[in-house]
Every structure is written in structure tokens, then in C-alpha cells.
């Protein structure tokens, strides 16, 4: 075997190594793009695409609770101080929400000041505890560009144990319950009772008050 044969083998090995690196880079880029597609660029939480991805994988497996959170008076803050301050406030609130996320508790920002919390494998009393915890976490002063900002939240809750309940129906129920919480004075949560077609089962103020 002469030296040219060795050189040829080395060249082939180098080409294979380069191709493998290129494949790995492409796959990493694809994975990064998938992550970015599911991530809200303002808050870093999952976005609407992430929520759709969750629903596509869930397919009615196990008990599920949907908590629809809307920040109280956020529009006033946004209009008064500007969108950049509003975005900073959303990031701060999202940081608080991320403290209680895990594989069974997922947080999504679906637009504006609206968030969805999904709780898997849930029990009703634990869902209400989570709602109170969320209200307690976000209800505090936030300091953005020398402004002291204070927000509270209104939460609508719906739960299902059935694989036949569609996501659109669940979101509509949680949304309706959230608006019921708004009508009750905000800074509280309400639970949708599907069997009676009623919005309110129980309302409690945040953990710092009545829980």
C-alpha cells in the first residue's frame, strides 16, 4: 500500500466526518426552530403554537384542568406607560408563573395579557390551590423603569375527565369563567360547572387574603 492509498483513506474519513457534522448541525437547527416556534418571544413561555402542540399530543389522556388567566388593568398600564413597559411587566409576571411550572403544570401566553395554565393528572382541590397560588404570586408591586406597577389577575377554571371534551369547548368554558371572575370584582377565580351550565362554583380571593 503506497502513501496515496493512505491519503485517499484519510480524505474519505474527513468527508464522512464533515457530512456527519453537517447532519448534526441541521438536526440541531431543526430542533431549535421547533422550540422557537412554540416559544413566546416576549415572555419565553409557550405560545399558541405550543398550546396547539400540547393538544395534539394530549388526546384526552387523563384528567385535565384549564386555568385561563387575564391580568386586571393591564391595558391601562400599557396605554399609560407604553408597550415597552407593558412587555417588561409581562416578562416579570411570566417569571413568577414559571416558578410553578413542571411536567404536569404548563404555562402558555396566548396573546396580550392572557395566559393559559394546563394542569395534568389533577384533583379539583389541587386546581383551586394552584389558582390561589397564581393569584398570590402575581399580585405584588413590579418596578419597571422607575415605575411602580401593581397588577392582579382573574382566573377562570374548567376541568374534564373525559376524552370527548374538545379543546375549543374547554377554552370557551375557562374563558367564560374568567369573565365571571371579572364581574365579581377581579383578583379572584371562578370554576365552571359543566353539569349545571353555570360559571361559578366557588370564588376565593388570593392566598394573601382569604385562602
Descriptions of predicted regions:
Residues 2-41, 49-62:
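Signal-transducing coiled-coil linker helices
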Residues 34-53, 69-83, 91:
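Conserved nucleotide-binding and Mg2+-coordinating catalytic segments in signaling enzymes
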Residues 38, 94-125, 142:
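Conserved helix-loop-beta segment at the catalytic/binding core of cyclic-nucleotide signaling proteins
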Residues 65-70, 107:
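Active-site-flanking beta-strand signature of metal-NTP-handling nucleotidyl enzymes
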Residues 74, 93, 107, 115, ...:
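Hydrophobic framework residues that shape the active-site pocket
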Residues 79, 118-122, 160-161:
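Residue-level recognition of strand-loop junctions within catalytic nucleotide-signaling folds
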Residues 94-98, 126-147, 173-175:
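Alpha-helical scaffold within the catalytic cores of cyclic-nucleotide enzymes
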Residues 107, 133, 147-148, 154-162, ...:
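Cyclic nucleotide signaling catalytic output domains
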Amino acid at each position: 500500500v503506497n502513501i496515496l492509498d493512505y491519503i485517499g483513506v484519510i480524505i474519505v474519513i474527513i468527508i464522512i466526518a464533515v457530512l456527519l457534522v453537517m447532519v448534526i448541525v441541521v438536526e440541531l437547527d431543526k430542533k431549535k426552530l421547533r422550540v422557537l416556534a412554540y416559544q413566546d418571544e416576549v415572555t419565553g413561555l409557550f405560545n399558541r403554537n405550543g398550546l396547539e402542540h400540547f393538544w395534539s399530543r394530549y388526546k384526552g389522556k387523563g384528567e385535565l384542568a384549564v386555568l385561563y388567566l387575564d391580568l386586571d388593568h393591564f391595558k391601562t398600564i400599557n396605554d399609560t406607560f407604553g408597550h415597552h413597559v407593558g412587555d417588561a411587566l409581562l416578562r416579570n409576571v411570566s417569571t413568577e408563573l414559571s416558578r410553578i411550572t413542571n411536567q404536569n403544570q404548563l404555562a402558555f401566553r396566548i396573546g396580550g395579557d392572557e395566559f393559559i395554565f394546563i394542569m395534568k393528572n389533577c384533583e379539583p382541590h389541587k386546581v383551586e390551590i394552584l389558582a390561589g397560588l397564581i393569584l398570590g404570586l402575581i399580585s405584588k408591586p413590579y418596578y419597571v423603569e422607575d415605575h411602580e406597577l401593581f397588577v392582579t389577575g382573574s382566573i377562570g377554571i374548567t376541568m374534564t375527565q373525559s376524552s370527548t371534551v374538545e379543546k375549543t369547548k374547554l377554552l370557551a368554558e375557562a374563558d367564560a369563567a374568567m369573565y365571571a371572575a371579572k364581574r365579581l370584582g377581579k383578583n379572584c377565580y371562578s370554576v365552571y360547572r359543566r353539569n349545571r351550565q353555570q360559571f361559578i362554583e366557588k370564588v376565593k380571593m388570593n392566598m394573601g387574603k382569604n385562602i
